[in-house]
């Protein structure tokens, strides 16, 4: 007779971000998204909105999602985050790197709040950041640009002044091979 081996239950990403115990274990999670623009006018916001909709479709009644659009950095970002905190939002995605300082201020002021900002290289115990490894795609784009370019000159339009932009430019140039 072969013994039956039982695999331990796999934890999903939410269990790492939002450990729960006791009466909280059955509580419906509330996840908020803060957008600088609207999903209709910004591809960046639209991509995050697709993620929000995927959460709704996948988790159904287990997770409630909300979003706030047209939040201006350095003007009403702090208050938008505060509104979600006041509404007992468990996890807040601030989708603009331009709102990092408001995110960090709120994370420090409300250490129990789980705030993630879409940006790079902020190391602080109260906030987490996330961002795609865009340099990999930029490297491949550089390879294509290098093959197609008729001269040694190519252009790059940077989206915003953040740490990762220079890594993207460097990857593009490495890929181009010049």
What are these regions (language model features)?
Residues 74-90:
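Short, well-structured alpha-helical segments in soluble
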Residues 1-28:
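Short, low-complexity disordered leader/linker segments with a strong preference
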Residues 130-152:
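Hydrophobic alpha-helical segments within soluble ligand-binding/sensing domains
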Residues 108-132:
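Flexible loop/hinge segments that line or gate small-molecule binding clefts
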């Amino acid at each position: 007779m072969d013994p039956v081996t039982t695999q331990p239950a796999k934890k999903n990403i939410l269990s790492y971000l939002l450990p729960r115990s006791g009466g909280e274990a059955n509580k419906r999670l509330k996840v908020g998204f803060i957008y600088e623009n609207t999903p209709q006018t910004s591809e960046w916001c639209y991509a995050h909105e697709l993620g929000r909709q995927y959460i709704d479709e996948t988790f159904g009644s287990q997770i409630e999602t909300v979003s706030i659009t047209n939040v201006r950095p350095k003007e009403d970002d702090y208050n938008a985050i505060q509104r979600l905190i006041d509404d007992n939002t468990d996890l807040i995605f601030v989708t603009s790197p331009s709102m990092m300082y408001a995110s960090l201020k709120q994370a420090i002021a409300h250490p129990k709040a789980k705030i993630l900002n879409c940006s790079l290289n902020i190391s602080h115990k109260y906030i987490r950041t996330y961002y795609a490894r865009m340099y990999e795609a930029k490297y491949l784009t550089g390879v294509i640009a290098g093959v197609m370019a008729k001269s040694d000159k190519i252009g790059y339009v940077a989206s915003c002044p953040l740490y990762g932009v220079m890594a993207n430019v460097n990857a593009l140039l490495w890929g181009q091979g010049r």
